[in-house]
Amino acid sequence: FFKSKGNVDSDVVLSVCGESGRTVEWLVDCYGVQLQLVKGFLYPGHTVLRMHAPPSRTGAELIASLVTACERAGIDILTNAQVTKLFSTAGGMIRGVEISRPNNSRELIGCEALILACNGYGGSPKMVEEFIPEIANAIFAGHDGNQGDAVLWGRKLGAEIRDMGAYQ
């Protein structure tokens, strides 16, 4: 609430806060992800210690352990592939994707469920202009692949999008 000066959906904030501790415990207990409370550093905007990280405090270790947890749970993760098309039922259920690989090969992959995820849209000047016009001319230091694809897909499927103006 403090960092956003109260400009948030309080129900969403309370839900995230209420479930985050149980989520950390679930990752540790059910999937063996090694996480510990980060002590000695109060993250910006935080009033108490609450950040958890792997022992090395590196993103590489965290991602590796999360990938291992997904593999144990039978969840497929595709990398080095860009989704070029979604296939859905008349009711809007996604049942497959078309992907392209760096060598320009294409694959069709069926699915029972699909998580639309992207690491932001900072690499898309058009989306930055639309959602955060005050930083439209800012230098973007992230990955060029951050084009907001999941946001675009969600819109096409009729999903509601909100709170798109936040940035660090």
Predicted ranges, named:
Residues 40-42, 90, 101, 118:
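Residues that line or immediately flank small-molecule/substrate-binding pockets and catalytic motifs
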Residues 1-76, 80-82, 126-129:
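Conserved N-terminal/central alpha/beta ligand/cofactor-binding core
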Residues 102-105, 109-168:
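Glycine-rich loop(s) and the adjacent beta-strand/alpha-helix scaffold that form part
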Residues 54-112, 148-157:
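Helical element adjacent to the flavin cofactor pocket in flavoenzyme catalytic cores
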Residues 39, 47, 55, 90, ...:
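Solvent-exposed, flexible loop/coil residues
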Residues 20-27, 92, 133-138:
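A short, terminal or domain-edge coil/loop segment
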